[in-house]
């Protein structure tokens, strides 16, 4: 499915301002001011300057929290977003109850204790973010994330992403697969499942090193439609139902 | 959600011809001709006369198999439909490998061995059918069944049904699945109905259709709570 740009000229704008460039700018700016986020039980609150808030919005990290303060802006980050800024981009600090967590392992352990599936989700999040996809929560489509080619103001999201591991609770029965495929199709997205392979149960999960050992397998699932898959149109007529193919575009 | 009739006058037509009446007609007709169904590994093929085929269609049992025969019609029934006609309405016979299955226990065991969750799905199917809902496969909506108030030519289906059982339920375990099902059913103007089939563990009766008596069905609808539509002053009633 081709990307669906929201207005004429949006594609040109996106090409002129690649996400990777905005992220570099953001990284520099946040590192300079030594921004620090406050950890709570389900998210991270980050206090930034107005220009940084604008940069965060351009890169689609977090959501602005409305407040009356003029000089400071508060941004609410999900665990994945905060840890990505902290660990991958190394541009924010994280503090818990007024105490700065110097060691990234401490932050990792805290987030993992609050959300047991955090390691799996973070691996999936950082996997796509590293490829410059913009990720948002997939709450309203019954998936884990939705992925945008560029900023959501320019383009509709292309993939609805389900994060899976060996013992996941999704897509185990046909009715669930039909449900997820039909819903994604009806909002013009492709269902992308990310299988995160790794040992989530063992001691290793406590070490960030394990992130390096985790592998991510990408699969898109789409409905196989006989009318659109006539032999003369596609040479690979031996497709399975549903059509599962490796995602080369990512 | 109110039923969505497909055309003006459809509601009057539905009221004039209740499904229960058509089912009684079908029952006496099939009993008279001793209709015979052939069991395969995933469905039952029933051979009937053309008037009976028309009656089956009006009650929404099975699908017509296109054939060149003029006097005989072939109807493809799902296991649930066939067992309902056989066990509940007692109006068809079923044979396997050319041998008629006189005993309902034999049929029950064959179907259970072909389809693992047959007992649970059949309990849910007969539960709804007994209340004169018309039950069709929910394949295209990612659910087990969809139910209609009357014939699908008159009305849109109102509920998308997921059948759940203790221990065997693989759906709705995580929030993303619930969100997915609720959003999808909402987008096609249906309500999500979850039928929890509770079975008492009774090893003696487990292999018999008699165990159906011990099953209870709990009905639950799930939908999105929308704060704007649930203001205090509006919901006083």
Swiss-Prot record, chain A:
CDD domains in alphabetical order: tRNA-intron_lyase_C
Active-site residues (renumbered): 148, 156, 189
GO cellular component, as recorded: nucleus
Record keywords, A-Z: Lyase, mRNA processing, Nucleus, tRNA processing
Catalyzed reactions per annotation: pretRNA = a 3'-half-tRNA molecule with a 5'-OH end + a 5'-half-tRNA molecule with a 2',3'-cyclic phosphate end + an intron with a 2',3'-cyclic phosphate and a 5'-hydroxyl terminus
EC annotation from Swiss-Prot or TrEMBL: 4.6.1.16
Main function: Constitutes one of the two catalytic subunit of the tRNA-splicing endonuclease complex, a complex responsible for identification and cleavage of the splice sites in pre-tRNA. It cleaves pre-tRNA at the 5'- and 3'-splice sites to release the intron. The products are an intron and two tRNA half-molecules bearing 2',3'-cyclic phosphate and 5'-OH termini. There are no conserved sequences at the splice sites, but the intron is invariably located at the same site in the gene, placing the splice sites an invariant distance from the constant structural features of the tRNA body.
Protein name: tRNA-splicing endonuclease subunit Sen2-2
Annotated organism of origin: Arabidopsis thaliana
From Swiss-Prot, chain B:
Keyword Flavoprotein among UniProt keywords: no
Alphabetical GO biological process terms: mRNA processing; tRNA splicing, via endonucleolytic cleavage and ligation
Keyword Methyltransferase: no
Gene3D superfamilies, per the entry: 3.40.1350.10
Effect in UniProt of substituting residue 24 to L: In strain: cv. Landsberg erecta
Catalytic residue positions: 148, 156, 190
Highest taxon listed in the record's lineage: Eukaryota
Enzyme Commission code(s) on record: 4.6.1.16
InterPro entries assigned: tRNA_endonuc-like_dom_sf, tRNA_intron_Endo_cat-like_sf, tRNA_intron_Endonuc_cat-like, tRNA_intron_Endonuc_N, tRNA_splic
CDD domains named among the record's database cross-references: tRNA-intron_lyase_C (cd22363)
Effect of residue 52 to Q: In strain: cv. Landsberg erecta
Cystine bridges: none
Subcellular localization, as worded in the UniProt entry: Nucleus
Keywords: Lyase, mRNA processing, Nucleus, tRNA processing
Reaction(s) this enzyme catalyzes, per UniProt: pretRNA = a 3'-half-tRNA molecule with a 5'-OH end + a 5'-half-tRNA molecule with a 2',3'-cyclic phosphate end + an intron with a 2',3'-cyclic phosphate and a 5'-hydroxyl terminus
One term of GO molecular function: nucleic acid binding
GO CC terms of this entry: nucleus
Subunit (UniProt): tRNA splicing endonuclease is a heterotetramer composed of SEN2, SEN15, SEN34/LENG5 and SEN54.
The family this protein is said to belong to: Belongs to the tRNA-intron endonuclease family.
Function: Constitutes one of the two catalytic subunit of the tRNA-splicing endonuclease complex, a complex responsible for identification and cleavage of the splice sites in pre-tRNA. It cleaves pre-tRNA at the 5'- and 3'-splice sites to release the intron. The products are an intron and two tRNA half-molecules bearing 2',3'-cyclic phosphate and 5'-OH termini. There are no conserved sequences at the splice sites, but the intron is invariably located at the same site in the gene, placing the splice sites an invariant distance from the constant structural features of the tRNA body.
The name this protein goes by in its record: tRNA-splicing endonuclease subunit Sen2-1
